[in-house]
Amino acid sequence: MSKEEVLLNEEIDFKEVRCVSDNGEVYGIISSKEALNLAHKAGLDLVLISPNAKPPVCKIMDYGKFRYQAEKKQKEARKKQKQIEIKEIKLSTQIAQNDINYKVKHAIEFLESGKHVKFKVFLKQRELNIPDAGMDTLGKVAVMLEDIAIAEKEPKLEGKHLNVLYVPKKKEKH
C-alpha cells in the first residue's frame, strides 16, 4: 500500500466524516476538522479508510504501524505463492538415442519434483527451412514422457530453436 493511495490528516478535506478510533470506539459523524483535532489529541493520525462511503469513513490510528502491518501481510502473501521453476534441456537434431534417454531421465526427475521442463532443439541454418528433424527429436521425447507429463502447447519455432514445455500431470487422489 503506497503513500499516494491513502489520504492523511490535513489532506482529508470532507465536510463530514464517520470517525472511528483505533480500538473500535465510534465517534459518529463529525466534521473532518473535529476528527483531526481528536487524532492530534491522541497523538495519532487521521486516515481515510473508505472515501466512497456516504459519509467517508476515517480512522484515528498510528499510520506508520498501519503501513508496517499492510506491508507485512503483503510479504507473507508473496511467501505463500508457489514459484514455478522451469528447467531447460537442450537437444540437437543429430543427438543419439542413448543421449535422448539420458536427458529424458533427468527431465523425469525434474517433473516428479514438480518443476516444468522446456525442451529446446537447436536447428542449424540448413535445418531451419525444414524443421522436421527437430520435430522428430521432440516426438521421441514426447513418447518417453507421455505417462509423466503433458506438453503445454505444440512445439513452436522461435528463432533457431524449436521449443516445447512439459508440465507434470496432476496426480489422481484415491
From Swiss-Prot:
Top-level division of the source organism's lineage: Bacteria
A molecular-function term among this protein's GO annotations: ribosome binding
Location in or out of the cell: Cytoplasm
Keywords: Cytoplasm, Initiation factor, Protein biosynthesis
One annotated GO biological process: ribosome disassembly
GO CC list: cytosol; membrane
Record carries keyword Protein biosynthesis: yes
Record flagged with keyword Protein biosynthesis: yes
InterPro entries, A to Z: T_IF-3_C_sf, T_IF-3_N_sf, Translation_initiation_fac3_CS, Translation_initiation_fac_3, Translation_initiation_fac_3_C, Translation_initiation_fac_3_N
Function comment: IF-3 binds to the 30S ribosomal subunit and shifts the equilibrium between 70S ribosomes and their 50S and 30S subunits in favor of the free subunits, thus enhancing the availability of 30S subunits on which protein synthesis initiation begins.
Family in the record: Belongs to the IF-3 family.
Subunit structure: Monomer.
UniProt protein name: Translation initiation factor IF-3
Taxonomic source organism: Helicobacter hepaticus (strain ATCC 51449 / 3B1)
Gene: infC
